[in-house]
Amino acid sequence: MEVVQSSVLGRLLLPVWLWLRARYEYSLLARVLRGIAQAWSRACAGSVLIQFVTREGCLSKAWKDSGLCRILTFLLSIPTILLQKLYGACREAFENSVAARIVFAVVEETPLAVAWLMLVIMVIPFKYWNNAYSFAGFLLCFLLAVASGMRKRNFRLDLAFLGPWIVAFGAMILVAWPLSAYPSLSTRFLLYYVTCMLCVVVIVSTVETWRQLTRLMAFSSLALLVMSLAGLYQRIQGVEVNPSYVDMNLNKGMPGRVWSFYENPNTFAEVLLLLIPVAIAYMLCSKGWLGRFLGFFSAAVGCVAMAMTYSRASWVGLAFAAVVFVVLWNRKLIPFGILAALVVLAILPDTVFNRILTIFNTSDTSTNSRFPLYQAAGEFLQQRPVLGAGLGSDAVRQAIGDLNLFHGKDHFVHCHNIYLQVWCETGLVGVISFVGGILWTFKKGCRAVARATCDPVVRMTILGGAAALMGTMVCGLADYIWNYPRVMLIFWFVCALTLAGIRLAARQDGEETSAPVSE
């Protein structure tokens, strides 16, 4: 506020803002909106949905102290335990060694290494990208995480705050590979999933302060800004209209769709969907003007780039993410959010508005082409519902081709629905554990942000991550968001960021005794 008041623009606009605020405070519009907000709050407080979200289930309560959780945590932490014993036996030698102190200083900054790694991963252009980069990077971060616990007696790689469902999904991934109908086609996809597992375990286990959370959000916002500016530059340079991306009869006059560093406009839009809520959360929780500016500018440019992707499923997902964010943050702002949405609709370019109108138009070639995909996936699941085809879209595509189940005009690539695709790959238990894991994360996040004692930075991190995950799950109803492994990694990075915030919130309430939440 002091920065605004001391600026020339602030001195000019602040009196106008204060005058408008005073007039609005006692206006009829303000009373109507406050009444709507209060009625909404009362309705939500007693709703079945709110009770479901805020109630902690029996499995969730039992997981942390269960024998299975303890055994898995012990097995995963064996290398760290051995290093701790080595440090205890040679403590004096390590403490007196300059080289050892330098190594400890490096490995204990694992969250910073993850932040830099994710920044690089998200901004490498598609033609230079190789999925081996992310696997090698997170394998190195995992080794750093293991070594970082050498001097911390109680440090363990954390599975308790991953929850039973995500752990079960990870187990199903490992099982789905040997049980695959086409193991050779599933091998490389196993590495993609293992990369995501390493990402989640490393972030949840090593983030110990709100400053580390803020740093991860800052680097994510910076990556969002870079890729969004690349998309805007692409639009300025000119993008050729690709008929395979759009129905030219229903979208006349629509320009080419931008894709930035991700080859496909839908893929780029899905990345924006995951990162925009995180950037907004970073803006709202930053303590300095530079962080607030980065969060605001990256989110604003990201929204402009999102419009230029013309990706309808991601638009719907972003709208849903905005609703989730506002409801969790301050339900009284819902009427203002509705007004803001109406204003945005009124000023949208004609091409964007016309694109929105085609969302439920079944004559659209993109929409119409999905029905044969869904039908083929449904028929396959009738034949192999429990085990699925095996990891990866290649195995599913091969299985459906061998059974001659797809009868569309084009060829079968994937199911264009994340729930069907995960079911076809990992079987019934896999899809249940996946959906259960994301809902478990969302529920734990809702419970954490509802506590009055929750740290503001931790709270906003959870809000941004939970909103992004829910929006992406809605987007996944019409698209397979993990078609590109890099997007799958970003999805699990946001999930890990949310879980890390939940862990810090629980630690603050005394549910876990370890390092402090703040520094």
Placement of each model-derived feature along the sequence:
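Transmembrane signal-anchor hairpin modules in multi-pass inner-membrane enzymes, especially those
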Residues: 1-175, 181-188, 208-214, 218, ...
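Alpha-helical transmembrane segments of multi-pass inner-membrane proteins
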Residues: 120, 171-175, 198, 214-254, ...
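Membrane-embedded alpha-helical segments of multi-pass membrane proteins
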Residues: 131-149, 190-199, 268-276, 315-323, ...
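Transmembrane alpha-helices of multi-pass inner-membrane enzymes
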Residues: 139-145, 332-333, 339, 463-519
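Membrane-interface catalytic loops of GT-C/OST-like multi-pass glycosylation enzymes that act
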Residues: 184-188, 265, 310-313, 412-417, ...
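A membrane-periplasm/extracellular boundary helix in multi-pass inner-membrane enzymes
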Residues: 229, 235-238, 326-365, 375-383, ...
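Long extracytoplasmic/lumenal interhelical loops at the membrane interface
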Residues: 245, 360-375, 387-426, 448-452
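A conserved mid-to-late transmembrane alpha helix and its immediate loop/hinge
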Residues: 303, 308, 374-378, 384-387, ...
